[in-house]
């Protein structure tokens, strides 16, 4: 597509002479700009893209999109006060509105997005409707897999990834949809067919000014759904009705406690999986999932509801597939080769940590204890630090350590966490590797060790450096030294 075609009918102000030169790419990173690119000069939290516009032009940019006009740039400038929306508009048009050629499923909620998206993708694949995946752990775009650190990528990348799915002849795109992504318009011009709400608890209050603002961002996904779409909602949530009222799509509910279209009952837990009865339209189906914990029953129900309703696949077939699908990496991922069961989990919010601790405590023998290694991320919501300590204290012994401190002092974060403990039933070890080593050294064969907070991550972020760090690999390394 050439520049004149791309900018035709744009609502932005255009400065400079528009030619029919071909547009090669759209990017926010001036370091990646090449000849024929459009540079999106976004103002971020830590730097301003406008400071790099000259560099982008030197590298071959044919136009710069910004919220600020720069009279010294010798290229076309596309100026809008709503730059995120402009970026979304340009990206969708440039890549040919790829979401219109896919069944797009968006999953939002505080916890569970990764597991639900993982399950839905595999169920779609099993029903001969191959799906791509965009999420926290990775983006699967057909034969290619990308790890870029985004749960919901910026519009330029998001539309590019969707276009790759179309090119790979996929039928669907299953996406984790973050509240931040919704709030800053990254999802504009994505045509969703299905919206899923997993749950709603406190998170991202470092970005959103209040819980109500956080909830309103989540509601935005459901307001985007068409009347032909599906709104799949956890009916056990106190806010379920508000999400159903916010959409014109067909509501489909799932749950355990409240009556729902897809309801679980007679739940039986074990260390190796979960059995339950699935009730649907008066029929009862026996279900088994290798996933453990009540929170994962909700995840399984959501995935089955989406696939059954959207694809009209045979329900017994979906149940048989679920019986063979394990957890995504770093989501209650078990390691059974140690002195006791060890689990790696991404839980980094109070609610997620509570769910995981409750699940594992139920698996303990009467004289066993739960040992939890955890910390809190720096430059993130500080209000949850005390609460995380209070959660762990309910269930077992805490080993408080460093998570991703980012720009903060690790000791300061740990001190804020520890102020939440009421009893001295915890230990402090700033070095995360040493914390894991210590937890394993004090564990008996009657205990369970949970290493929480980082899950699938293979790095640790400090103020001046990011180092390689993988909780699972550290655990396996410590265990190998016992042999």
From Swiss-Prot:
Post-translational modification: Carboxylation is probably crucial for Mg(2+) binding and, consequently, for the gamma-phosphate positioning of ATP.
Entry's EC annotation: 6.3.2.13
Residue positions of motif Meso-diaminopimelate recognition motif: 403-406
Subcellular location: Cytoplasm
Record: residues binding ATP: 109-115
GO MF, one annotated term: magnesium ion binding
Major site of localization recorded for this protein: cytoplasm
GO biological process, one term: peptidoglycan biosynthetic process
Keyword Nucleotide-binding assigned: yes
Catalytic reaction list: UDP-N-acetyl-alpha-D-muramoyl-L-alanyl-D-glutamate + meso-2,6-diaminopimelate + ATP = UDP-N-acetyl-alpha-D-muramoyl-L-alanyl-gamma-D-glutamyl-meso-2,6-diaminopimelate + ADP + phosphate + H(+)
Modified residues (N6-carboxylysine): 218
Residues the entry annotates as binding UDP-N-acetyl-alpha-D-muramoyl-L-alanyl-D-glutamate: 30, 151-152, 178, 186
A Gene Ontology term for the protein's cellular component: cytoplasm
Record's function text: Catalyzes the addition of meso-diaminopimelic acid to the nucleotide precursor UDP-N-acetylmuramoyl-L-alanyl-D-glutamate (UMAG) in the biosynthesis of bacterial cell-wall peptidoglycan.
Name this polypeptide is given: UDP-N-acetylmuramoyl-L-alanyl-D-glutamate--2,6-diaminopimelate ligase
Organism of origin: Chlamydia abortus (strain DSM 27085 / S26/3) (Chlamydophila abortus)
Taxonomic lineage from the root: Bacteria, Pseudomonadati, Chlamydiota, Chlamydiia, Chlamydiales
């Amino acid at each position: 597509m050439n520049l004149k075609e791309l900018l035709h009918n744009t609502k932005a102000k255009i400065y400079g002479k528009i030619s029919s030169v071909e547009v090669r790419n759209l990017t926010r990173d001036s370091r990646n700009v090449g000849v024929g690119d459009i540079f999106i000069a976004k103002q971020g939290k830590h730097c301003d893209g406008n400071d790099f516009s000259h560099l982008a032009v030197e590298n071959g940019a044919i136009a710069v999109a910004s919220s600020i006009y720069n009279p010294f740039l010798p290229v076309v400038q596309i100026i809008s006060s709503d730059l995120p929306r402009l970026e979304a508009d340009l990206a969708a048009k440039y890549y040919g509105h790829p979401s219109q050629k896919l069944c797009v499923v968006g999953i939002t909620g505080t916890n569970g997005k990764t597991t639900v998206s993982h399950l839905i993708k595999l169920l779609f694949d099993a029903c001969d409707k191959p799906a791509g995946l965009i999420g926290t752990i990775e983006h699967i775009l057909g034969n290619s897999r990308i790890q870029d650190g985004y749960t919901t990528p910026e519009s330029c990348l998001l539309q590019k990834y969707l276009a790759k799915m179309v090119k790979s002849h996929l039928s669907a795109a299953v996406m984790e949809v973050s509240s931040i992504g919704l709030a800053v318009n990254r999802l504009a011009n994505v045509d969703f067919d299905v919206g899923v709400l997993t749950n709603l608890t406190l998170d991202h209050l470092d970005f959103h000014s209040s819980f109500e603002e956080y909830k309103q961002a989540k509601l935005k996904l459901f307001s985007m759904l068409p009347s032909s779409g599906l709104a799949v909602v956890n009916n056990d949530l106190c806010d379920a009705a508000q999400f159903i009222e916010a959409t014109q799509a067909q509501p489909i509910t799932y749950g355990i406690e409240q009556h729902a279209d897809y309801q679980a009952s007679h739940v039986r837990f074990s260390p190796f999986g979960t059995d339950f009865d699935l009730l649907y339209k008066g029929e009862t189906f026996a279900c088994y999932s290798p996933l453990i914990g009540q929170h994962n029953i909700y995840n399984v129900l959501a995935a089955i509801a989406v696939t059954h309703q959207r694809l009209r696949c045979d329900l017994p077939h979906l149940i048989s597939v679920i019986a063979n699908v394990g957890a995504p990496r770093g989501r209650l991922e078990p390691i059974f080769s140690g002195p006791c069961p060890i689990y790696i989990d991404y839980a980094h919010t109070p609610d997620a940590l509570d769910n995981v601790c409750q699940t594992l405590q139920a698996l303990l023998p009467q004289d066993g204890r739960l040992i939890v290694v955890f910390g809190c991320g720096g430059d993130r919501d500080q209000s949850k630090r005390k609460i995380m300590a209070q959660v762990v204290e309910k269930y077992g012994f805490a080993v408080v350590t460093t998570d991703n401190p980012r720009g903060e002092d690790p000791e300061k974060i740990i001190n804020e966490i520890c102020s939440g403990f009421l009893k001295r039933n915890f230990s402090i070890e700033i070095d995360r590797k040493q914390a894991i080593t210590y937890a394993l050294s004090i564990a008996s064969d009657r205990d369970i060790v949970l290493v929480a907070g980082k899950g699938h991550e293979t790095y640790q972020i400090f103020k001046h450096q990011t180092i390689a760090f993988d909780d699972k690999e550290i655990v396996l390394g410590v265990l190998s030294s016992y042999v």
